[in-house]
Amino acid sequence: GNGHLLFQLLEDINEEYEGDKTFEYTGIDYSPDSVKFASGVAKRKYSELKVNFEQVDLLQESCSFLQNKFDILLDKGTLDAIALNQESLADFNGKIGMDVYASQVEKMMVQGSILLITSCNFTKDELIKIITKDTNLEVWDEINYPSFQFGGVKGSTVVSIAFVRN
């Protein structure tokens, strides 16, 4: 995407963190244009920080980027976008992207890594099922948003769940 979430995170950490540890920030997107845009913003506004953007296709089995390991991974709409395409993937024996997303992301995690997903397309239960099926990920925490009730069902317009890798 445009890197907004990553930029907000690094600004907040720089304001709040008082230790001497340095952090590296990496943003990924499928679109080369999005990566170019976010890289330009990073260069103009955050040149003193370790910020990198890469064009990555998570749905390629041979994606070498997945060899990288991260402590925290944030997804704000990636799974939602992947789920819109219901075409089968040749690399994954005809499975659809939504069904391989979690196992692909898990490759970038070590024990104790956190994956925070924000979705406007899935319910809490649906998201938990998608992410925990066939992975070593389990629910760690969630963000509670204001909810509403419609047709006897209570819900919210957005769901954010943090998963930890065991």
Segments and roles (model prediction):
Residues 31-33:
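Conserved SAM/SAH-binding beta-strand->alpha-helix loop
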Residues 38-39:
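Conserved SAM-binding loop
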Residues 2-21:
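Conserved SAM-binding loop of SAM-dependent methyltransferases across substrates and taxa
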Residues 59-74:
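A short acidic, Gly/Pro-enriched loop at the edge of an enzyme's catalytic core
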Residues 124-166:
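Class I S-adenosyl-L-methionine
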Residues 24-29:
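Conserved SAM-binding motif I beta-strand of class I
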Residues 75-79, 84:
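A short beta-strand submotif of the Rossmann-like class I SAM-dependent methyltransferase core
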Residues 88-111:
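A short glycine-rich, Lys/Arg-flanked "PGG" loop and its adjoining helix->strand segment in the class I
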